[in-house]
Amino acid sequence: MQLLEERILTDGNILGENILKVDNFLTHQVDYRLMKAIGKVFAQKYAEAGITKVVTIEASGIAPAVYAAEAMDVPMIFAKKHKNITMTEGILTAEVYSFTKQVMSTVSIAGKFLSKEDKVLIIDDFLANGQAAKGLIEIIGQAGAQVVGVGIVIEKSFQDGRRLIEDMGIEVTSLARIKNFENGNLNFLEADA
């Protein structure tokens, strides 16, 4: 997605050898116009897939996921990273390792929001090692629902996340694919949409 790649080049900051900071438009402050455009691209890509739910993980996946859900006219569910006293029955959980925060979290979704009839599109802000998506796939599987695809805003293609998900037989659609970071710059691969 050219608009997204341009925004990454303009407002993204490279930290160290493999971290891209995009807090100016995605991970802290949100550019809703860009998120709306991202949502439309995912909706167009999966228009014929019969998606019934969009699922993400809190927090930075929420903005692109809600706009994708709006464009598809389906509900959006976000997995919670912290225990909630109001979530007491029928909780679906998975352990997820965060590459950025370098911590293990138990993420959860109330089972009443997913059923075996659901066809789910997972949306997330980043794909690095694939652990967040893998955890969501596990939770969705516990409900008996089908994961139709994983939509990613920014993929770090030099890490193993895509291969992990595709080896599970699930399609990955990334709107910006980073080939590498080199001398303080980043290089893109061709995006999926």
UniProtKB/Swiss-Prot annotation:
Annotated pathway: Purine metabolism; XMP biosynthesis via salvage pathway; XMP from xanthine: step 1/1
Key words, A-Z: Cytoplasm, Glycosyltransferase, Purine salvage, Transferase
Record InterPro entries: PRibTrfase_dom, PRTase-like, Pur/Pyrimidine_PRTase, Xanthine_PRibTrfase
Catalytic activity: XMP + diphosphate = xanthine + 5-phospho-alpha-D-ribose 1-diphosphate
Annotated localization: Cytoplasm
Purpose: Converts the preformed base xanthine, a product of nucleic acid breakdown, to xanthosine 5'-monophosphate (XMP), so it can be reused for RNA or DNA synthesis.
Enzyme class (EC, first level): transferase
GO cellular component: cytoplasm
Family per similarity comment: Belongs to the purine/pyrimidine phosphoribosyltransferase family. Xpt subfamily.
UniProt subunit comment: Homodimer.
Binding site for xanthine: L20, T27, K156
GO biological process, one term: purine ribonucleoside salvage
Gene that encodes it: xpt
Pfam families given in the database record: Pribosyltran (PF00156)
Chief location category: cytoplasm
GO MF term (any one): xanthine phosphoribosyltransferase activity
EC number: 2.4.2.22
Protein name stated in the entry: Xanthine phosphoribosyltransferase
Lineage, uppermost ranks: Bacteria, Bacillati, Bacillota, Bacilli, Lactobacillales
UniProt binding sites for 5-phospho-alpha-D-ribose 1-diphosphate: A128, N129, G130, Q131, A132
